[in-house]
Amino acid sequence: MACAKEAARHGARVVLFDYVKPSTQGTKWGLGGTCVNVGCVPKKLMHRAAVIGQTLHDAHHFGWNVAEEDMKFDWNQLVTNTRNHIRMLNFGYKKGLKSASVTYINGLASFPEHNDGHTLQYVKRFKEKEPPVPLTFDKVLIAVGGRPAIPSNVPGAVEHAITSDDIFYLNQSPGRTLVVGAGYIALECGGFLNECGFDVTVAVRSILLRGFDRDCTNKIYEDMVRWWCGGGAGVVGVVGVLLFVCVDMGKLVNW
């Protein structure tokens, strides 16, 4: 969007295509890309919810007497408010593109098989069964971002697993959760779920946060063992390609 608006500011006629292919669980969202819809924004809102929960538990140290039985976490309320905030941002981005004289098309663009280098075709959302519409251009910028992948060679993963594309839109709480992987997105999601009161197990192939400073990641690991395991969560590590994780009252997961 930044490139589209900048090009329009310099006098170019600009069309911006945005299309979200639903996740394996059917999750889809509006204009704004990963950060706004399934990344930074919802993650920070849910992290904030987790921090507030911890603050309530510690409030009595600062003179606030909040009874434990009165502290009830409502997942549906959090998800509803998160969605509403994201929709507000989606609307704001649409207005911003219009103000910048950028034509926004909610559709899937592609290059035809026999391409002259200056033609693409697109199908608008909700009109996928209609013939593609051709569009000529002088220059094209491809900036589609990335999506999380579910390994298709793991039986049941595609049908039952969710990703960060889904966690912020779940209509019911995730309950006991196995987080497979130990990158920063995995630990962020596992962290706010744990602090919101859910039992979380993180399955680690080798080390946490590969590529990050080891002193910092070792400290994070120590804190996870200290705080997560005390609340019913766990950290399971393995060196190799096959992992067996047995979660109490849950299922045996082969990885």
Predicted regions and their residues:
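Rossmann-like NAD(P)H-binding beta-loop-alpha module
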Residues: 171-207, 211-212
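N-terminal start and proteolytic maturation junction detector
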Residues: 235, 243-245
